[in-house]
Amino acid sequence: MNIHEYQGKDILRKFGVSVPKGIVAFTAEEARQAAEQLFEEQENPVVVVKAQIHAGGRGKAGGVKLAKSPDEVFDIARQMIGCTLVTHQTGPEGKEVRRLLVEEGMNIEKEFYVGITLDRATSQNVLMVSTEGGMEIETVAEETPEKLLKIQIHPLQGLQGFQARQAAFFLGLEGDKFKNTVKFITALYKAYTAIDASIAEINPLVITKEGKVMALDAKINFDSNALFRHKDFLELRDISEEDPFEVEASKSNLNYVRLDGNVGCMVNGAGLAMATMDMIQLAGGKPANFLDVGGSASPETVEEGFKIIMSDKNVKAILINIFGGIVRCDRVAGGVIEAAKKVGLDMPVIVRLEGTNAEIAQKMLDESGLNLIAANGLREAAQKVNEALS
């Protein structure tokens, strides 16, 4: 689950991670009042107005601006709230700005990158630091890997003091700046583990001219599978930032991810879903979604998934690929039939069913009177999808 920058900073602050003073605003007037409060409390002659959306690249898109007075903050906020911000992470449709973070300005001397996430290749958390703060870390890793240090963290031992010092040495810091950075990294790891985050990224981490170490930006994502331990974090969820199809799917406990293709997919099992998407691509099509109905799918959840797929206007054909192990094929067939009758079929639907009660399911589909195309294998199913689209 993703949260906004200001929410992430509020959480990090509780664990001793240094972050600038900031106030969230939902209107231009609230932004002005926030600026008045910050100017009274700080010596810096500027504040920063930052659009709050679940995407990076806001600065280049005009979503981060400096202001020297409350009136200037008001004017910026009036232009920014309600506008659509398009970044390299939002896609061409962009995201509407509904809230802002008004934050104290910083006298920046140096910028770095610090992040902690899970390295799936080693099944360990990894601390990453780079001297190239403010840049996309993927770009740094690809173009200048010598400027990125990765430190594996043993799951039983946790982050060790020498590892935090190693990271600070890599950044070329000395004296109080070195000590403060070690303290910062240690606090960040403490927060990362305590809240069950999947990523805690500070980009940039800044050293101010006064010697302070501060998180100028913060990206915190939670492990959704651990949210049962942090029910208060569910209140931080901003549904308006999420894809409406994915929100609807989550209500039925469906694993759905929207893509930009034209072939809707309904599959049971993440591995089979990935293989199905690959086969569609190889056959000349393009997947419109990832949808795993899971092993305990009921006719109701299948029906809901089918409706969600058909609600996507980009979908021109649907491939249903079910291997019945735990989930019974007749359950899936029942859900498809009910959904098709309620929504109406106006596109080709290719069905491949194998496993538990596959013959019963096929008979149900044959007797339904619906225009469904049967396939006897995954490759054949993908080819029939491509034929239906041509």
Curated annotation (Swiss-Prot):
Pfam families recorded: ATP-grasp_2 (PF08442), Ligase_CoA (PF00549)
Cofactor note: Binds 1 Mg(2+) ion per subunit.
Nucleotide-binding found in the keyword field: yes
UniProt keyword list: ATP-binding, Ligase, Magnesium, Metal-binding, Nucleotide-binding, Tricarboxylic acid cycle
PANTHER family reported in the protein's UniProt record: SUCCINATE--COA LIGASE [GDP-FORMING] SUBUNIT BETA, MITOCHONDRIAL (PTHR11815:SF10), SUCCINYL-COA SYNTHETASE BETA CHAIN (PTHR11815)
Reactions catalysed, as given in the entry: succinate + ATP + CoA = succinyl-CoA + ADP + phosphate; GTP + succinate + CoA = succinyl-CoA + GDP + phosphate
Domain ATP-grasp: residue ranges: 9-248
EC code(s) of this entry: 6.2.1.5
Gene from which the chain derives: sucC
Record-given protein name: Succinate--CoA ligase [ADP-forming] subunit beta
GO BP terms, alphabetized: succinyl-CoA metabolic process; tricarboxylic acid cycle
Enzyme class: ligase
PROSITE patterns for this protein: ATP_GRASP, SUCCINYL_COA_LIG_3
Pathway(s): Carbohydrate metabolism; tricarboxylic acid cycle; succinate from succinyl-CoA (ligase route): step 1/1
Organism listed in the record: Prosthecochloris aestuarii (strain DSM 271 / SK 413)
Protein origin, superkingdom: Bacteria
